[in-house]
Structures are given as structure tokens and as C-alpha cells.
Amino acid sequence: MAGILEVCVDSLASAQAAIAGGADRLELCSALAVGGLTPYAELLQQIRAQSRIKIRCLIRPRAGDFLYTKDEILLMAAQIGNLKRLGADGFVIGCLTADGELDTAAMQPLLKAAEGTGLTL
């Protein structure tokens, strides 16, 4: 089984370099210096205008832990909907409980918003 070369990018230039280097898929982020945040919609549009490479967008509204409030979950679901409309092929998501377990209840609105796309947890 062949692997997939996914490259994390946060700019048009890094996306172009990844594509030229043979990437199969991009993980699109912003602010990699803080571990990555949700990318700007305009950056997705720029890349999509130049390439049909598969793009999964990180959904992370802030730096720090992965314990999200209900308002943050609603924001994340809205971000998924917007980026999905603009051509994202999938999303990279994750919510944790205070015990460090996957918070499946918190992730339900995100899974619903991302329906029909690829997911990385």
C-alpha cells in the first residue's frame, strides 16, 4: 500500500513548493509557530485557484490546549462550513476532555459540518 505525502503549509509559497516537491495532499494552517491555527479563507482560495491538489484545513481557533468551549465549537463548525464551500477537501480536527481523552460529544457538530469530506483526527 502506497503512502500519502501530506505537507503542512501556511502560505502560497510553501504550498507551491510542496506541490512542486511531489506532495499528494496539503494540510493548510496558519500560525505554525504556535502549533497551527485555522487558515485564512483567502489563502485557501489562492491555492485552489492554482491547483486541484487535495487540501485538508486545520480547524483550531486559538493556540493552547484542545479543551474548547461551546462557543469555540460553534465557531469551529462555522469555519468548517465556510472552508468547505471554498473548496477544502477535508479537515484536521480534535477536541479533548480535561482527562486528555477524545471529546466525542464536543466533536459532533464538527463532524456534522464536515460531512462528505475527509477527516484527520
Feature locations, PLM:
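Active-site-adjacent beta->alpha loops and helix N-cap segments on the catalytic face
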Residues: 12-16, 20, 32-56, 70-78, ...
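Non-catalytic positions within long, well-ordered alpha-helices that form the structural scaffold/packing
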Residues: 19, 84-85
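A short acidic, helix-capping loop that chelates divalent metal ions and anchors anionic groups
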Residues: 62-68
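Short acidic/histidine-rich motifs immediately flanking catalytic phosphotransfer sites
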Residues: 22-23, 87-88
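Hydrophobic faces of well-ordered beta-strands that scaffold small-molecule active sites
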Residues: 3-7, 26-28, 47, 55-59, ...
